[in-house]
């Protein structure tokens, strides 16, 4: 059982966390050293803060963006060769939209099938554009109503856009047609919906696809429970309990084991993805109930080990088959919301103070091999494509490349 296979070219970075949404890149030759004066191909000024991450489609780089003080929700397209802004499209949403100061609007990353781009603008709706910026369709998805805003990114499976809408009183998961935006299925999970004033319940988790035998399964980290459903119909396949009310990270896949990690000091679970129905008592491999940190960024699995940088800036390595924590280490004295990526034989992850930490995927000891400073706040996750790294900070979008 493995992550579902992508249909697009390996060099493109078509969604948050890369081709499979797992934080694993096949890129080689990416820079290992950079700063404001080294290996910067270009940088462009951004007129608004944001937590969403860039994606790369052929010669174009895309981000979602909300200009400071504006009602606009934007999808921006840049030329990857020099950072020229090619076009800006989106929507105007003049109603008040609740979010938190740490989570600016347009927090969801776009996704592409290589021909079209889909962006979720929260209460402003779900939009689809072609690569030239022509709008193909839009869907009114409802109003997001949660004190901390939204953050899950849409993903594409076959001809469907899959969206974890929420958190808040209107939460649901749905599939929409890539052709015209028509709703194919929608469902709400029992624990997913919070009351009007329930701050500490909800899922900001981006779903992940997993191949099981000859079929593929949609994995969803939801309050209290990890769910596996059919991406085509939304019907249950299996679930596993043991989580808490707040979920930020995406599920992680290690062979036939799926790991889901709650946020806000909540538990982590691992379940063997075999069978149907409630697998809590029969297939749950381990449960970490105590001593858990706040987790916002997702980890990455290399071999049998999971590596993650938690929000307080403490990295963990976990042996997935047993749940043993093989090491913990505070890194660079900075907190992080960014997700970790395995690329070119090592690990990379951003911190909020604008550094990117490089580590060896060493299961026996924390081994930092480099720290690169840009010195600007970031909560986004880098994109990797054709030897280049794209980093979105609160001030700029960067293209990082080895100098010739």
Name each region found by the language model:
Residues 5-404:
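Noncatalytic, solvent-exposed loop/strand surfaces
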């Amino acid at each position: 059982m493995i992550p579902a296979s992508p249909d697009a070219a390996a060099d493109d970075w078509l969604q948050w966390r890369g081709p499979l949404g797992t934080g694993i890149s096949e890129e080689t030759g990416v820079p290992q050293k950079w700063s404001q004066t080294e290996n910067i191909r270009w940088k462009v000024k951004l007129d608004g803060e944001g937590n969403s991450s860039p994606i790369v489609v052929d010669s174009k780089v895309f981000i979602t963006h909300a200009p400071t003080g504006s009602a606009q929700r934007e999808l921006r397209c840049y030329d990857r060769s020099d950072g020229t802004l090619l076009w800006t499209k989106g929507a105007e949403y003049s109603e008040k939209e609740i979010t938190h100061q740490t989570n600016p609007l347009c927090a969801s990353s776009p996704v592409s099938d290589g021909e079209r781009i889909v962006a979720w603008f929260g209460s402003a709706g779900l939009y689809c554009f072609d690569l030239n910026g022509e709008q193909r369709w839009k869907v009114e998805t409802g109003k997001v109503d949660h004190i901390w805003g939204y953050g899950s990114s849409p993903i594409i499976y076959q001809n469907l856009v899959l969206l974890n809408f929420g958190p808040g009183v209107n939460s649901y998961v749905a599939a929409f047609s890539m052709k015209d935006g028509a709703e194919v299925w929608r469902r709400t999970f029992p624990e997913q919906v919070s009351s009007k004033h329930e701050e500490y319940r909800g899922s900001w988790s981006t779903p992940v696809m997993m191949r099981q035998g000859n079929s593929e399964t949609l994995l969803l980290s939801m309050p209290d429970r990890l769910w596996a459903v059919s991406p085509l119909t939304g019907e249950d396949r299996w679930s596993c309990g043991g989580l808490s009310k707040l979920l930020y990270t995406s599920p992680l896949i290690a062979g036939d084991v799926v790991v889901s990690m709650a946020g806000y000091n909540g538990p982590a679970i691992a379940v063997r993805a075999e069978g149907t129905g409630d697998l809590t008592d029969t297939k749950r491999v381990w449960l970490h109930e105590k001593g858990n940190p706040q987790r916002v960024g997702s980890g990455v699995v290399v071999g049998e080990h999971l590596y993650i940088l938690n929000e307080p800036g403490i990295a963990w390595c976990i042996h997935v088959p047993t749940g043993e924590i093989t090491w913990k280490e505070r890194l660079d004295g900075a907190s992080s919301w960014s997700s970790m990526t395995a690329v070119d034989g090592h690990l990379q992850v951003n911190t909020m103070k604008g550094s990117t930490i490089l580590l060896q995927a060493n299961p026996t000891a924390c081994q930092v091999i480099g720290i690169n400073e840009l010195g600007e706040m970031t909560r986004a996750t880098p994109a990797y494509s054709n030897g280049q790294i794209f980093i979105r900070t609160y001030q700029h979008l960067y293209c990082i490349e080895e100098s010739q």
